[in-house]
Amino acid sequence: MVQEFNVLRCFSCQTFQVQQVKKAKKWTCKVCGEKQSLIKEFGRGAAADCRRHVQKLNALRGEQHQLNTQQLLAQGDEENENEDVYEVLDPKSEQEEAHVSRWSKYTDQTTEGPNEEKDDEDEDENVYTERPQFRIQGTRKRKKMSSLEPFGGNCDNYEESRAGYSQFRKQAYLPLQLEKRSSSSWNKGSVSKYSNCQRPDDVVPSARTKLPSSRQTVGHYPTACSSSTNTMENSIGNKQQIKSSYRPPTADVNKHLPIQSESPSVSSHQKFGESTIENKDSKWNKFLTIVPTQDKEEYYYESQNGKKTLIPYFTKADTVVDFEERRCPADEKDSGILNRQKVVGGNASCPTTRLPTKSVGFENAVCKPVLVKAPYSSLSLNPLFCTDEDFDDTS
């Protein structure tokens, strides 16, 4: 029996080929190797006849493929030539089409003419868009509107009225402020230490203030336990008044007391600028004598046993302050301090309290007996007073 062959075509590579006839309906392409089913036969017969037929079919397919490629190339060349010619002939038309806005189809070109476009261009040339000019113009307009709205007049009148109103308020406020300052400073009853720095109008009420007189301040002396409630200047003024008005009492014994000073110094009145004011109402003036040499500042005493040793001395400024601090208690005032002193062993002493050594110098000057040349005593020097007579205050 003779073997049969058939001519088939691959669906992927489109080539014709010879395949042996089989019972199965599946075959595989010898060129691309794609497995596919049998759909169409282009010939059946002997092997030699099938090969000649396949060669003819493939040759025809190749020629047709070349024609198709040539046609495609020819069409591409013609299109390129046409484009080049179009660009050379109409370059202006393309530029105009490119410059045309896409919004032109939505606008009415019939209403707009060439004259209107020229007018718009002229207006655009005269417009300035600088920011500083716009800011200045806007602020000026706003200021004018804000100034004209409240009063409805000119801007100058408004500013003048504002200036006058502000001056009136300042003038009305100044007297109130001065009254507050003056009332706060003078109601305290004391002159402030900053009174020299105030205005001349504020210093005027100082003449109306009532300051304590010298007689009122002399009535009470500061003690060690008393506390000062006044200001600094009042306390200094009271001390100066006490120093100037009070003079320590001296007994008749001072007539016989020789007071010597090797180096006389400036008196305390000249040193501190005080004035001597005597209390004429005192009942002790008839028993006291003022020695002109009491203005000497320092006192000293020399012993007579050949040793020149200095006994504690005092100053007149110290006697004024220390006298009240070192005196006897208040219950001994009725009969007088001098009445309570007694001579014990040639020295006077206070019966109730013993005075410290600092008060010795003070009472030595006040109640010192007549100094007699005698050997130096080992006893401490205490205030001495020779008489036991009581002073009658009623006389």
Curated annotation (Swiss-Prot):
Which residues lie in Polar residues bias regions? 104-113, 224-244, 260-270
Q: What does it do?
A: Plays a role in the cellular response to DNA damage and the maintenance of genome stability through its association with the MRN damage-sensing complex. Promotes chromatin loading and activity of the MRN complex to facilitate subsequent ATM-mediated DNA damage response signaling and DNA repair.
**Entry's family note:** Belongs to the MRNIP family.
Protein name (record): MRN complex-interacting protein
Task: Tell where it localizes.
Answer: Nucleus; Nucleus, Nucleoplasm
Q: Which GO terms describe its biological process?
A: DNA damage response; DNA repair; mitotic G2 DNA damage checkpoint signaling; positive regulation of double-strand break repair via homologous recombination; positive regulation of protein kinase activity; protein localization to chromatin; regulation of double-strand break repair via nonhomologous end joining; response to ionizing radiation
UniProt gene name: mrnip
Sequence ranges of Low complexity compositional bias = 183-195
Compositionally skewed regions (Basic and acidic residues) per UniProt:
90-100
Q: Which UniProt keywords apply?
A: DNA damage, DNA repair, Nucleus, Phosphoprotein
Q: Where is composition skewed (Acidic residues) in this entry?
A: 117-127
Region ranges (Disordered): 90-155, 180-275
Q: Which GO terms describe its molecular function?
A: chromatin binding
GO CC: one term? nucleus
Record's keyword annotation contains Nucleus: yes
| Organism of origin | Danio rerio
Motif annotated as Nuclear localization signal (NLS), chain positions: 142-145
Instruction: Give the principal location in a single coarse category.
Output: nucleus
